[in-house]
Each structure stands twice: as structure tokens, then as C-alpha cells.
């Protein structure tokens, strides 16, 4: 019993505080986003699916900002939250891009650039952390701008339909192209920052 109480005190605040619960909700929203388009439901037309998918993505994106803000405000920053938050973000974006590719709303090149970058830089950050050099590839303003543009472009492409005279597909396509360019530039920057460690590791082998 003492061991069980100790385990509960340690794990409950870490795994189930409010910021982490918001992050878990963002992860749970991902299969819901997929189901909107893949589960047959005759009562839903394309517009309804687009609207629901857009709302889900926007709500999930809001939790991305909210969980970090709450963690800092409430003093509930945890290692689990620091790990889950970027994982949830990348999963959400990558799944949305795959769905948009399947719907024919973006081209494969854009999806490959953005998804490839997320996988590459995530792996790079983990490796840099393992050798004590994570600060060299910490998120900077370029990464934040890239993320902001992605989070604006994807809802437009999910909604797809025009809003009055505003063509969501047209402007969403331009913005996701801009995001892909920013993605490539930020990847090159992070690889350059990590190059001394990468070169040293290669030399050691």
C-alpha cells in the first residue's frame, strides 16, 4: 500500500494534470479527424465533413497553445508534457496533410517536404539531446513562424469551400506552399546548427 500511494502521488500529477490532459485530447482528436472522412455516414455531405474536420483541427490547435500556457501559468511543466506536446503537434499536422493529399487538395511534394522535415528534425533533436547538445537545435522563430503558417493553411484546406468571396482552397494552397518553403529553410538551418556534432559522430565511426 505505501508503494501504491507513492506511485499514485508520482504519476497522477505528471500524467493527468490539466495541461497534459489537453495534450491527450489533442492526440485523441487525430483519429476523430480521420473518421470524419473515412467512416461512411450518408447523412453527411462533403460540406458537413469539411466543416466538422475544420472545427476539430482548430480546437486541437487551440489546445496546442493552451496546454503550454497553462503549464507555465500553473507551474505544472513536466517531462511527460514536454515530450507529448511536440509529438501531438506533429501527429496532428502529418495526419491532416495525409488526409488532404488523399482528398486531392495538396500535392505530394508539399506533404513529403513537411512530413519528412518533421520526422528528420524530431529524430535530430532526440539524438542531440542524447549527447547533451539539444540547445543547438532548440525551436527558434523560424520554426514558430512555420508552425503558425501551417496552422492557418490546414483549416482553410480542410474547409475547402469558399466563404463569401474568400476562396479557402486558393489561399490555403498558397499558404501551405509558403509553409513548405519555410519548412525546408528551417530544416536546413537546424541541420547546419547540428553539423559539427553530425560530422564529429561520423568521424568517430
Regions found by a protein language model. Name each.
Residues 4-205:
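Alpha-helical transmembrane bundles and membrane-interface segments of multipass inner-membrane proteins
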Amino acid at each position: 500500500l505505501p508503494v501504491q500511494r507513492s506511485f499514485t502521488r508520482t504519476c497522477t500529477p505528471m500524467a493527468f494534470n490539466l495541461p497534459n490532459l489537453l495534450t491527450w485530447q489533442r492526440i485523441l482528436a487525430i483519429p476523430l479527424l480521420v473518421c470524419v472522412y473515412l467512416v461512411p455516414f450518408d447523412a453527411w455531405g462533403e460540406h458537413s465533413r469539411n466543416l466538422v474536420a475544420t472545427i476539430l483541427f482548430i480546437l486541437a490547435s487551440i489546445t496546442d497553445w493552451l496546454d503550454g500556457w497553462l503549464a507555465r501559468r500553473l507551474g505544472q511543466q513536466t517531462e511527460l508534457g514536454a515530450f507529448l506536446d511536440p509529438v501531438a503537434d506533429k501527429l496532428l499536422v502529418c495526419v491532416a496533410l495525409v488526409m488532404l493529399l488523399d482528398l486531392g487538395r495538396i500535392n505530394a511534394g508539399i506533404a513529403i517536404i513537411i512530413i519528412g522535415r518533421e520526422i528528420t528534425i524530431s529524430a535530430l533533436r532526440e539524438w542531440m539531446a542524447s549527447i547533451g547538445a539539444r540547445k543547438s537545435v532548440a525551436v527558434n522563430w523560424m520554426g514558430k513562424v512555420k508552425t503558425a503558417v501551417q496552422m492557418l493553411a490546414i483549416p482553410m484546406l480542410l474547409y475547402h469551400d469558399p466563404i463569401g468571396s474568400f476562396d479557402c482552397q486558393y489561399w490555403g494552397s498558397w499558404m501551405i506552399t509558403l509553409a513548405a518553403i519555410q519548412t525546408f529553410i528551417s530544416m536546413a538551418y537546424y541541420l547546419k546548427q547540428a553539423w559539427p556534432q553530425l560530422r564529429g559522430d561520423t568521424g568517430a565511426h
